[in-house]
Amino acid sequence: MTIKDELNRILWTRRDLENYSVLIVDRFKGLVEIPFPRIERVDNTYIYLDDDTVIPIHRVMEIRMKGQVIWSRTANRR
C-alpha cells in the first residue's frame, strides 16, 4: 500500500483520528510528529494541514497509531 493510500484510508474512515500521527522529515527541525487531526487532505504530491502548511508527501517517514508504527517508508520500499 502506498503512503497516499494509507493516509487517505485513515482520513476517509474518520474514526479515532486522534490516535494517529505522521512522522515527517523537516529540513530544519529534523523528525517532527504531526497529529493526524491536523491533516485536511492528501493528494498525489502533498499533505495539506489545517494551518495552510503544505508538506511534500515524500517527507513522510512513518504513520503511527497510539505510538506504534503501522506504516514505515523503510519497511514499505519496493
Curated annotation (Swiss-Prot):
Disulfide bonds: none annotated. InterPro entries: MJ1316, UPF0248. Pfam families: MJ1316 (PF04457). Transmembrane segments: none annotated. Belongs to the UPF0248 family. This is UPF0248 protein Msed_0897.
